[in-house]
């Protein structure tokens, strides 16, 4: 069986149920080994005309057959059925609970991992952990623990019975077993390695398929269906080859076990027949001995299956352990406080930041203050560091001490949950869940009423679009919201953030897909609905932020200027150049449309 720090706790947690299953297993194995004795009685009764029962020699009559053989056999079968049902419920039920608990632990750990982890590890690979690898662990925990105890208990009991009948014959029968044990150990190591390769190949295949399904529109637009099919075939072929290799090893192990069983039977028949010829065994005793050996055939087969399942289980557990051992880079420090009654002030104080895997500082000596109730725009060319500011405010990454303050308190002294709870966020990708529009808008507020959802949709200027849908707010969106337009996705995302009514609202380039008229309506609604609340708006178009209280202009990770639009246009040449270029682009676009 497999053991490890993430599995042992579940063995202990399910110990009472497993103990009950083990007791049922012991009962079944014990009474199962009574059956060969009845074989002896029947054979000797037929051959000799009499049987020895409890030290008494009795004539082999129908009454004796019924009383001492048939009725006890019926009771044995009934008890075996009850016992097997009981231990299956105990062992397999525990396996299901272990898998559920482990999957829940994985999910709980996954949600605490930093954004950097998800940038390195692909979704398809992670999903295979929750499906294939968890299923393997469940199979190993259920079937594996059953096989282990059944093979151990039944095998030892049967060997004891065989040893008492004739130890020399038993020693001869054990020689192939020792050889088989050595071969199985070597092959088990090889199977563990191959199973890890198999799971990784499946993960790569799943990840490739997931990316293709998500990006099918792009693939079709660039007419790359055939190219992607060829790439999929290559990965699928690799997956097939690894599976074939693993299957060959597993099949070879099964063949060797069968060879071992047949070899032992030959030994028993040969030497056992000799013992009968010598008069040391009678025919009934030889049949009884073979019955005991038949009882350990299952443990022998179970050993090969156990080697395979354990090899697979260890490989899957190693992959899951990598996830559970992944460090939680962004976490609360001991003794943090909750952010009580947040007002919405934000201050960056000489902050310099580099992404964990970055080669240069994306933000350099950033200092500015946002007072409660202010509406602030952050502009700059692509790569200037605008989104990095949002990442730090939302504590997606660790923040250097003494560089970021919310309501005058260092964010490192506040719980991450309370800081994020004080913010409402509209991300660049405008992610939507594959759920109804109502659930998407109400995601950030528990038990949001239909009236609240409708009001938020009106503020985001998307209500008219929603009511035009056949099912209105109950319209189910496709994966990541693919069934609505880019502008509708943005406005639904904005409605979701507005419904939360948080002290701090962050919009990361969140009106880029709407026209200027709709943009003006949304910005006017933001201004009227968020009086005395802080709004932070990251934008590429200057027209989006020019009416805000102040603008922070970033250039190559540094603050170039801070102030209202008119002031920056007059005092900052780089800002003025950006404004003029955008105006020229707008005018050129207008001429082209004309």
Question: Language model features by range: what are they?
Answer:
Residues 161-175, 245, 249-318, 323-324:
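Helix-loop-helix
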């Amino acid at each position: 069986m497999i053991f490890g720090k993430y599995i042992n706790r579940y063995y202990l947690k399910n110990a009472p149920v497993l103990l009950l299953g083990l007791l049922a297993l012991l009962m079944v194995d014990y009474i199962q080994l009574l059956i060969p004795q009845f074989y002896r009685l029947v054979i000797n009764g037929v051959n000799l005309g009499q049987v020895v029962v409890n030290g008494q020699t009795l004539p082999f009559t129908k009454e004796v057959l019924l009383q001492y053989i048939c009725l006890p056999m019926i009771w044995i079968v009934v008890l075996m059925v009850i016992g097997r049902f009981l231990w299956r419920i105990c062992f397999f039920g525990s396996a299901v609970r272990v898998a559920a608990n482990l999957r829940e632990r994985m999910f709980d750990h996954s949600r605490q991992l930093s954004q950097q982890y998800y940038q390195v590890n692909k979704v398809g690979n992670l999903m295979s952990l929750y499906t294939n690898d968890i299923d393997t662990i469940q199979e190993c925990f259920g079937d594996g623990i059953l096989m282990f105890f059944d093979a151990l208990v039944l095998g030892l009991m049967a060997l004891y019975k065989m040893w008492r009948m004739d130890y020399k014959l038993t020693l001869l029968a054990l020689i192939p077993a020792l050889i088989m044990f050595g071969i199985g150990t070597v092959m088990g190591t090889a199977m563990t390695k191959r199973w890890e390769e198999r799971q990784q190949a499946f993960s790569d295949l799943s990840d490739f398929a997931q990316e293709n399904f998500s990006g099918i529109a792009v693939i079709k637009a660039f007419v790359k269906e055939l190219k992607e099919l060829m790439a999929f075939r290559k990965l699928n072929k690799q997956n097939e080859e690894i599976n074939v290799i693993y299957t060959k090893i597993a099949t070879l192990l099964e063949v060797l076990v069968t060879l071992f069983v047949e070899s032992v039977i030959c030994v028993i028949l040969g030497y056992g027949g000799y013992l009968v010829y010598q008069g040391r065994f009678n025919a009934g005793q030889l049949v009884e001995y073979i019955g005991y050996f038949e009882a350990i055939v299952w443990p022998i087969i179970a050993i090969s299956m156990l080697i395979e399942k354990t090899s697979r289980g260890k490989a899957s557990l190693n992959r899951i352990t990598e996830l559970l051992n992944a460090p939680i880079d962004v976490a609360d420090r001991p003794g943090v406080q909750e952010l009580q009654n947040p007002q919405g002030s934000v201050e960056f104080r000489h902050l310099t930041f580099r992404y964990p895997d970055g080669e240069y500082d994306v933000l350099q000596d950033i200092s500015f203050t946002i007072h409660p109730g202010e509406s602030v725009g952050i502009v700059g060319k692509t790569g200037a560091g605008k989104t990095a500011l949002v990442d730090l405010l939302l504590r997606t990454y660790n923040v250097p001490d003494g560089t970021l303050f919310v309501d005058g308190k260092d964010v490192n002294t506040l719980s991450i949950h309370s800081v994020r709870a004080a913010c409402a966020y509209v991300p660049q990708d405008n992610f939507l869940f594959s759920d109804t529009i109502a659930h998407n808008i109400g995601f950030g507020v528990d038990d949001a009423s239909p009236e609240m959802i409708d009001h938020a949709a009106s503020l985001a200027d998307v209500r008219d679009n929603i009511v035009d849908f056949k099912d209105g707010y109950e319209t189910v969106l496709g994966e990541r919201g693919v069934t609505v337009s880019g502008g509708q996705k943005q406005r639904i995302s904005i409605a979701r953030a507005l419904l939360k009514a948080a002290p701090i609202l962050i919009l990361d380039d969140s009106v880029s897909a709407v026209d200027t008229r709709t943009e003006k309506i949304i910005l006017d609604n933001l201004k009227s609905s968020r009086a005395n609340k802080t709004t932070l708006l990251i934008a590429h178009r200057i027209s989006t932020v020019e009416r805000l209280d102040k603008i922070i202009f970033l250039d190559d990770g540094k603050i170039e200027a801070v102030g209202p639009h008119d002031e920056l246009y007059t005092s900052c040449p780089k800002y003025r150049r950006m404004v003029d270029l955008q105006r020229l682009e707008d005018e050129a676009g207008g001429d082209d449309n004309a």
